[in-house]
């Protein structure tokens, strides 16, 4: 089954992203995986999504956060959606 994983229609992933990013900002010495947010759910659907952004973004595969300078930038971000 193909799932829509765009940011505008994937509130679960976006919410997890935001919480994970805030957790990182609060504890810059410890980066957590988005799966930490959803690990208590029995099933999660993960995929890679390409998108352009003008804001800060995080690269979960490298387990680090990068502040992206203003301007369009392509990124591949690991996203998980609670089913």
UniProtKB/Swiss-Prot annotation:
- Induction context: Expressed in the early phase of the viral replicative cycle.
Main localisation: host cell
State the superkingdom: Viruses
One cellular component term from this protein's GO annotations in UniProt: host cell cytoplasm
Localisation:
Host cytoplasm
Under the subunit heading, UniProt states: Interacts with host IL1B.
Give the similarity note: Belongs to the asfivirus L83L family.
Say what the protein does.
May subvert the host innate immune response by interacting with host IL1B and interfering with its function.
Specify the protein name: Protein L83L
Please tell me the species this chain comes from.
African swine fever virus (strain Badajoz 1971 Vero-adapted) (Ba71V)
